Design a protein with these regions (language model features):
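Bacterial N-terminal signal peptides that target proteins for export
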Residues: 4-20
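Hydrophobic helical h-region of N-terminal Sec-dependent signal peptides
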Residues: 21-25
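C-terminal motif of bacterial Sec signal peptides marking the signal peptidase cleavage site
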Residues: 28-30
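OB-fold nucleic-acid-binding modules
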Residues: 32-240
Length: 240
């Protein structure tokens, strides 16, 4: 029988998805340089995995990070195409985490594919609907954003080392689990069941696009739900 799973992420831009054979999903001017807070190097012993960092918030609504904990991973999502407003996602082999960042143009300074080193001491982990996020403090809707003028104190962006590259993990629908939240995965040989529709529906009263769920189907007839943000730049474009 068909299996329906629900995705919590939003789709990546469909600009390069005219063929539906492969589909990628994701399961985030300062002050004067003389006064801008700088990124302090952390000892190697402070390096931990994303999974370890998130485990500090297990069973809790929030947890302040008071240890010297540093994570390092690829930036696999940002606000490019309107998908993750004021959010970047950092992913390492153990998992991914969304970081709330008070910057209106994150994609410029925190581009997809770059490497982010994040010093977490002084930040806060928040559990919002079962999803662990990192930010400045707890808020009503998850982690509050790290102020723009403080981002350079906590996050350093560098180019990948030679031969270092992020690759989306190829999965089947049945292999998706909680550990894949905020990670970039790939489904091969799938198609949209909603042919002819746009990525997002439009509210007939306001004329505005709304967050919309669409269904993809694999060769075995299994289904997976893909949710697209109302703010995405391709909301009114047809599904591939």
């Amino acid at each position: 029988s068909n299996t329906t799973l629900r995705a919590t992420g939003v789709t990546s831009s469909n600009c390069a998805m005219r063929a539906i054979a492969g589909l990628s999903l994701l399961l985030l001017a300062g002050c004067d340089k003389a006064t801008e807070p700088g990124f302090a190097e952390a000892p190697e012993v402070s390096r931990h995995t994303v999974a370890y960092l998130k485990s500090l918030c297990d069973g809790r609504s929030s947890a302040a990070v008071t240890q010297d904990i540093t994570i390092r991973g690829f930036i696999t999502a940002n606000d490019l195409y309107g998908e993750f407003d004021r959010t970047i996602v950092v992913e390492d082999p153990s998992g991914g985490i969304a970081i709330a960042a008070g910057h209106p143009l994150l994609a410029d300074d925190y581009p997809f594919g770059a490497v982010a080193t994040v010093r977490c001491n002084g930040l806060t982990l928040c559990n919002y609907g079962g999803k662990i996020e990192l930010g400045s403090e707890p808020g009503d809707y998850g982690a509050e954003a790290i102020p723009r003028e403080e981002l350079s104190r906590y996050i350093r962006v560098t180019l990948p080392e030679e031969g270092e590259r992020h690759r989306a993990a190829p999965l089947t629908f049945g292999e998706v689990s909680a550990r894949h939240i905020d990670t970039r995965v790939r489904f091969d040989g799938v198609r949209f069941a909603d042919a002819g529709k746009t990525w997002c529906d439009t509210d007939p009263e306001t004329g505005r696009t709304v967050a919309t769920e669409r269904t993809i189907v694999d060769a075995g007839g299994n289904e997976f739900t893909v949710r697209s943000a109302a703010t995405c730049a391709y909301a009114t474009e047809p599904l591939p």
